[in-house]
């Protein structure tokens, strides 16, 4: 059976293939091999530039350009050649080394062939390649995350003034505005995004057990830590000086945990919007030709938010597992991280699919102002809070208890609440303010806070 979207095992490459195409260049096998080639070429270039490594002659401008082109012009056909070599070597990184030696054969770079992968352990190449994948994958996700936050912020400002009955423990609570509740989400998303932005991926280039053993055996006078740092930082990464054979993956765990927190905020938002749709606070625009149920023709379901919720759960399951697992490796290393790291794109893929599903759902939402107003008008008991607060202010006896007796577990209307206020011996200004108050106007600073989105 040939491979295409219909025969793919994973829905990321099947049903949802058009939802995250940007990640293919990053997290595919091609993406990994491409970055291995980049790391190997960058290391060779640094060795050629090191004056004390006399056997690795300096590069001419033409040679430097040719070496860099191997990495920058790396194609899917090149990646296939690496995989063909791997069939013989049964070693993925060694296959990259042999591929590069093939590429420079017959050129002036060939005489530097034995300095390809010089003094490196495979993990020197792999950890930097994975770090580059995460750096590039993070850019893709951050763009989508910012689009999400901007969309919610725009909605928050548009509906900053629209009053809404809040619900705590699923029960009517003090009113707020639609915009302010959306603004809360933007603040939460931005905080977690800032944590993601703060993280620069660590990397190592220090040999088989992290001590530069092989490096010093060949060139004992070279400052290998400095040279290693130069290569790592030239690729936008941060040097981890203290490692075993592997870079400890704590930085990856931190990044995945940060993505999990951001995802959890979005998942919480998906569920809230789902609830508001079910309560009638939002309506969903119908799209001609779409069907909500195979048997109930009237249905318009919040499927985009449900899809997002499911994919966020999958993303966090993968990223959360990886964050826990990757921090653990036996002694100087075991190979359990290798197969685990091949699934980085799965967590990123489900996250991107989820974000785009939520954005699609938000694009269909319409505010149901009439339904919001109805719910507020049915719940005048929420004004028990301001009334008892003013009663406390003027020193009246048992204000909380009196309002509790009037309102708890029962429906009250405007007439009942206003008759209660009329009978209170309150100062004129306080009484007038309470008499004017309605559930729709009892929103505190919600409108102002909404504009912080």
Regions found by a protein language model. Give the residues of each.
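Glycine-rich cofactor/substrate-binding loops
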Residues: 1-34, 86-90, 280-282, 293-453
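Glycine-rich anion/phosphate-binding loop at the beta-strand->alpha-helix junction
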Residues: 192, 238, 244-330
């Amino acid at each position: 059976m040939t491979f295409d979207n219909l025969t793919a095992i994973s829905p990321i490459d099947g049903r949802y293939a058009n939802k995250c195409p940007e990640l293919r260049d990053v997290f595919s096998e091609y993406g990994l091999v491409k970055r291995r080639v980049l790391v190997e070429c960058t290391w060779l270039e640094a060795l050629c530039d090191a004056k004390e490594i006399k056997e690795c002659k300096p590069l001419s401008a033409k040679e430097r350009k040719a070496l860099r082109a191997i990495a920058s012009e790396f194609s899917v056909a090149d990646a296939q050649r690496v995989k063909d070599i791997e069939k013989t070597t049964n070693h993925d990184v060694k296959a990259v080394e042999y591929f590069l030696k093939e590429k420079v054969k017959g050129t002036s770079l060939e005489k530097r062939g034995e300095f390809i992968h010089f003094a490196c352990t495979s993990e020197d190449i792999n950890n930097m390649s994975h770090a580059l994948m995460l750096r590039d994958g993070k850019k893709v996700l951050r763009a989508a995350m910012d689009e999400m936050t901007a969309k919610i912020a725009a909605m928050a400002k548009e509906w900053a003034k629209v009053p809404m009955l809040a619900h705590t423990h699923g029960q009517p609570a003090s009113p707020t505005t639609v915009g302010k509740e959306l603004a809360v989400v933007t603040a939460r998303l931005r905080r977690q995004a800032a944590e993601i932005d703060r993280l620069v991926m660590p990397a190592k280039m220090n040999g088989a057990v992290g001590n530069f053993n092989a490096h010093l055996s060949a060139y004992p006078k070279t400052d290998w830590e400095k040279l290693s740092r130069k290569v790592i930082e030239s690729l936008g990464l941060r040097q981890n000086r203290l490692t075993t054979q592997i870079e400890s993956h704590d930085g990856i765990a931190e990044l995945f945990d940060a993505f999990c927190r951001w995802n959890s905020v979005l998942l919480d938002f998906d569920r809230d919007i789902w609830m508001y749709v079910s309560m009638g606070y939002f309506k969903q625009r119908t799209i001609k030709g779409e069907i909500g149920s195979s048997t109930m023709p009237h249905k318009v379901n919040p499927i985009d938010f449900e899809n997002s919720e499911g994919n966020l759960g999958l993303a966090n399951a993968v990223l959360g597992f990886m964050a826990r697992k990757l921090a653990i490796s036996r002694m100087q290393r075991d190979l359990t991280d290798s197969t685990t790291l091949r699934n980085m794109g799965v967590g990123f893929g489900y996250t991107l699919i989820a974000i785009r599903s939520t954005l699609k759902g938000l694009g269909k939402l319409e505010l149901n102002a009439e339904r919001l107003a109805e719910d507020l008008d049915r719940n005048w008991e929420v004004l028990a809070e301001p009334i008892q607060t003013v009663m406390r202010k003027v020193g009246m006896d048992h204000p909380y208890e009196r309002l509790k007796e009037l309102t708890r577990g029962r429906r009250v209307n405007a007439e009942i609440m206003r008759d209660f206020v009329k009978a209170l011996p309150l100062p004129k200004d306080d009484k007038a303010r309470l008499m004017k108050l309605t559930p729709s106007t009892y929103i505190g600073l919600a409108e102002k806070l909404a504009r912080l989105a």
